[in-house]
From Swiss-Prot:
Biological role stated in the UniProt entry: Acts as a component of the NMS (Ndc80-MIND-Spc7) super complex which has a role in kinetochore function during late meiotic prophase and throughout the mitotic cell cycle. Acts as a component of the essential kinetochore-associated NDC80 complex, which is required for chromosome segregation and spindle checkpoint activity.
InterPro entries: Kinetochore_Nuf2_N, Nuf2_DHR10-like, Nuf2_N_sf
Quaternary context: Component of the NDC80 complex, which consists of ndc80, nuf2, spc24 and spc25. Can self-associate. Component of the NMS super complex which consists of mis12, mis13, mis14, ndc80, nnf1, nuf2, sos7, spc7, spc24 and spc25.
Pfam families: Nuf2, Nuf2_DHR10-like
Sequence similarity: Belongs to the NUF2 family.
Gene: nuf2
Coiled coil: 51-80, 128-186, 316-426
Protein name: Kinetochore protein nuf2
GO molecular function: kinetochore adaptor activity; protein-containing complex binding
GO cellular component, one term: condensed chromosome, centromeric region
Length: 441
């Protein structure tokens, strides 16, 4: 027994026109002589158009079964066909075509294909008519998705900045630690150099004092030698003729000369020592200048250290601010996700309510069709009776006239009843649409 469907069957020309309007390539020959190779791509286009399931999405669903299925490469095509059939069957159930079978894919029949395409086209028309009722929800959903995408991109950007700041912070801390260690070493070296400088200055002052004393003594010796030479010249003028006295004076003079010579040798030695110490002092003075230059470099490094410390503090504040912004963005993201979830739940609830009301309306239409069928059968019976009475018109003309009037009155009452039922149905559908609009708003 053929299953009854709630949608009207469309004509061949109308089906081809609607499919062409959807932008799907499908010829009249493929509709009249359908094959599996022709209908499977057509159904794939329907899934892509109405469910957003592309061939790539289908491959991803099949590939997700790779870990749970043995010999995946061998049965890949069979798995793909099975998954495709399951999704397509679910789609057919949703558009009220409940007797879709695998034969419709493998060995499609012309009449069933025409019926299936009628179901899809009627669903597309109904979807297009009802789509305006959900425009606000769709726009809100798209707006929320765009906001979520933007916030997610900002969150990733901030995370990258935080990671970069943390890396810079670690590098700055390592550089600061190295600078602190180097500054500590240089500070200790400066303290030692300062101590050595003070010792060298003390030694230098002592040597200068000794040099000045030696210069004074040297001048004294020179003056003494000059006076001695003068005395010798005086003595030469007054030569002593007594040998004993002469020998005594000679001995005294020799002794004085030897003493002067020894003093001169000592003075020469001290002068050489002083020259050596002066050279050492000059070298020490060069070392002191180098130490002063190192000290200036240390001061520059200390300034750099202070600048790096200020920069580190600024980066730390920036990192803290970024963390605060990150937490705010995460909180905002959770709020948006909750709003999106609530909107989706509301949309699903509205769709479920709409489906229930549509099912009720379809059931009512089925009942009306059954009643109309019964009325039509009764009308056919009356017509048959009328034909029999027309055959006997010569015998019972008056009786036939009366029955004809009675039949016409019954037909008019039936027509009026049908019109009433039709007006009730239209009123019910209008009330249903108004309730749907009020529930959506």
């Amino acid at each position: 027994m053929a299953r009854k469907h709630t949608f009207p069957s469309l004509k061949r020309a109308e089906i081809l026109e609607c499919i062409d309007g959807l932008g799907i390539p499908f010829t009249a020959k493929e509709l009249d002589q359908p094959t599996s190779k022709a209908v499977i791509p057509l159904y794939e286009e329907f899934l892509d158009l109405f469910m957003g399931l592309t061939r790539q999405n289908l491959e991803e669903k099949v590939n997700s079964l790779q870990d749970s299925v043995e010999n995946f490469e061998i049965i890949h095509e069979s798995l793909r066909f099975t998954v495709f059939y399951q999704i397509l069957s679910q789609f057919m159930q949703n558009i009220c075509f409940h007797d879709f079978t695998i034969q419709d894919l493998l060995k499609p029949d012309r009449n069933r294909l025409q019926l299936i395409l009628s179901a899809v086209i009627n669903f597309a028309k109904l979807r297009e008519e009802r789509l305006q009722q959900f425009d606000d929800d769709i726009q809100k959903r798209e707006s929320l998705l765009e906001t979520y995408t933007l916030l997610d991109a900002q969150r990733k950007d901030l995370e990258e900045k935080v990671l970069l700041s943390q890396d810079r912070k670690l590098e700055s801390e390592a550089i600061i630690k190295q600078n602190e260690e180097r500054n500590e070493e240089m500070f200790q070296s400066l303290i030692e150099d300062k101590r050595l400088c003070s010792q060298v200055r003390t030694e230098y002052d002592r040597i200068r004092m000794e040099a000045s004393e030696l210069k004074i003594r040297y001048h004294n010796v020179d003056s003494l030698m000059a006076s001695t030479l003068e005395e010798i010249e005086k003595l030469q003028s007054s030569i002593v003729h007594s040998p004993e006295k002469l020998k005594g004076k000679i001995a005294d003079t020799s002794l004085r000369i030897q003493n002067d010579r020894s003093q001169q040798v000592e003075l020469d030695k001290k002068s050489k020592i002083l020259h050596t110490k002066l050279n050492s002092l000059q070298l020490i003075e060069g070392d002191l200048n180098a130490c002063l230059k190192v000290l200036e470099e240390c001061l520059v490094e200390l300034d750099k250290l202070e600048h790096a410390t200020v920069l580190l503090s600024t980066n730390q504040e920036l990192c803290d601010q970024i963390e605060i912004n990150k937490k705010k963005l995460e909180f905002r993201k959770e709020q948006l996700l909750k709003q999106l979830s609530n909107a989706q739940e509301k949309l699903e609830h509205e769709q479920h309510s709409r489906n229930q009301k549509l099912e009720a309306a379809k059931q009512r239409m089925d009942n009306i069709r059954e009643e109309y069928k019964v009325i039509t059968q009764e009308r056919n019976k009356k017509i048959q009776e009328t034909e029999k009475k027309n055959a006997m018109i010569e015998m019972t003309e008056q009786k036939i006239a009366g029955m004809r009037e009675e039949l016409e009155s019954q037909i008019s009452s039936i027509t009026m009843e049908f019109e009433k039922l039709k007006s009730h149905v239209e009123l019910y559908i209008a009330e249903l649409l108004r309730n749907l609009r009020s529930s959506n708003s």
